[in-house]
Amino acid sequence: MTYNEDKKQGDDGEHTGRYQRSTTRWRNDEMTYMNAEIKAELLALGKVDVEPSLLTRPSRSTAGPGAGLRSIFFKSGGHRVRLEITPDSPLKMVEQNGAVVILKDNQELVRGVIDPVVAHCPEQTYITISEQCMYDCKFCSVPKFQGKIKTLDQVLEIVEKVKKSGNLKTIAFTSGVATTPENEIDRVVAYVQAVKKYNVPVGVAVYPTQDSSQRLKDAGVTEVKYNVETMDREIFERVCTGRKGHSLDFILTSLHDAVRVFGKNQVSSNIIIGLGETDECVRKGVEYLAKMGVIAVLRPITISPYRKGEITATRPSAERLLKLTKMTRDILKKYDLHVEDSQTMCLPCTGCDLTPGRDV
């Protein structure tokens, strides 16, 4: 029997017909499909050993903590997850009778399909402009590579390629800070103006400046993301190094201004989980942002081999991810924030996170 997600799964995430929801698994006979609990388990491990025959075109990240690492997107039961590809994992992705199956301890954990990447992630043209950064955040690999800065022609070439494939639905830009935040905003604004002709939603995740929100809005940006990284001030000072004059308070002020410019449900911010913060700190941080109109994205820490010895971090457990995501879901509901309305970047992708309103 072939599993067809589009036909077998309702819009509300509940399977129909013979597909019934158990407390821990989606099952059809002995076949298991992903739900929130399984996705949390996959995210907690974060890595998978992939059978070589399935490695047709793995993705390599150029942004954030995962920069330089190969990964693969897997989809099942209406859920999507992104996993780092490495032989050093208790999970193994194999092909069985035409299906893609993830095994744990040689037992089937979940089955589904490999989700093809459009540009950086499925269903989005997600482009890293500057693969360089003047800052030295200890959780991020980008400063270790100091890669290239894409020209406008290179960006347009990527977008045109996606357009010709028929998959151009949204465009998202992210960027390191190659020289100064102000110079980066100048570059992003120019690139956004150049892609307006495609008439698709545009999201931008950058480091803010005093006037970045208004400039990005005027250029044609739909949604914006400024990452706080952590709401624990002591951790922020320890891991977000080299940000002289650019404090956590500055980012929070910038987020407040972004909501003024873009409106509720159009602004988001990453909170990294696994840097040593308490659950109570996460709760207070999520609520602080939600009161502003900002949607918090809880991002499990990727412990990069390129930062070995520079940071103490622990990948969150499945139980912790579920607990914090359910808490976030309830807080967002309290402040009338709707993840499902997001059109660009991480919230609709869901690959790296357990996402409230979509996964839970």
Where are these regions (language model features)?
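A C-terminal junction/extension of Radical SAM enzymes
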Residues: S59, Q266, R320-V360
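Core AdoMet radical
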Residues: S141-E157, K163-A190, A194-S254, S268, ...
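Conserved C-terminal portion of the radical SAM core fold
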Residues: D232, D249-G309, L322-H338
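Flexible glycine/acidic-rich beta-alpha junction loops that bind and position SAM and/or redox cofactors
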Residues: E234-G242, I273-E277, V297-E319, E340-G357
